[in-house]
Amino acid sequence: MSVDQATVRRIAHLARIKVSDEDVPHLQDELNAILRFVEELAAVDVEGVEAMTSVMPMPMKKRQDIVTEGEIPDVILANAPEREDHFFKVPKVVE
């Protein structure tokens, strides 16, 4: 599998990342290298290997479950393609 320049632009658009035309070939090469590595990993036989989340056993750090006022709608909605008042506006998908 490989990524073309149009796919790089589409990924950038979906991620809301501004990518210049001169950066597209470099990102294309990097994404293709990542995909090649993933294909190598997919070829590894892991039959009988127990699944794990970390090489070293580490307890998960938990944060306090505290209700806050938030009061940062502009920060939260900064990357929203469309918004209305203090809400994300999404296209209608169900008739």
From Swiss-Prot:
Gene Ontology process terms (BP): glutaminyl-tRNAGln biosynthesis via transamidation; regulation of translational fidelity; translation
Catalytic function, reaction form: L-glutamyl-tRNA(Gln) + L-glutamine + ATP + H2O = L-glutaminyl-tRNA(Gln) + L-glutamate + ADP + phosphate + H(+); L-aspartyl-tRNA(Asn) + L-glutamine + ATP + H2O = L-asparaginyl-tRNA(Asn) + L-glutamate + ADP + phosphate + 2 H(+)
Pfam hit, one: GatC
EC primary class: ligase
SUPFAM superfamilies, A to Z: Glu-tRNAGln amidotransferase C subunit
Keywords, comma-separated and alphabetical: ATP-binding, Ligase, Nucleotide-binding, Protein biosynthesis
Annotated Gene3D superfamilies: Glu-tRNAGln amidotransferase C subunit, N-terminal domain
Enzyme Commission numbers on file: 6.3.5.-
UniProt GO molecular function: asparaginyl-tRNA synthase (glutamine-hydrolyzing) activity; ATP binding; glutaminyl-tRNA synthase (glutamine-hydrolyzing) activity
InterPro entries to which the protein is assigned, alphabetical: Asp/Glu-ADT_sf_sub_c (IPR036113), GatC (IPR003837)
Coiled-coil regions listed in the entry: none
Quaternary data: Heterotrimer of A, B and C subunits.
Entry's family note: Belongs to the GatC family.
Function description: Allows the formation of correctly charged Asn-tRNA(Asn) or Gln-tRNA(Gln) through the transamidation of misacylated Asp-tRNA(Asn) or Glu-tRNA(Gln) in organisms which lack either or both of asparaginyl-tRNA or glutaminyl-tRNA synthetases. The reaction takes place in the presence of glutamine and ATP through an activated phospho-Asp-tRNA(Asn) or phospho-Glu-tRNA(Gln).
UniProt xrefs under HAMAP family: GatC (MF_00122)
Identification of the protein by name: Aspartyl/glutamyl-tRNA(Asn/Gln) amidotransferase subunit C
Originating gene: gatC
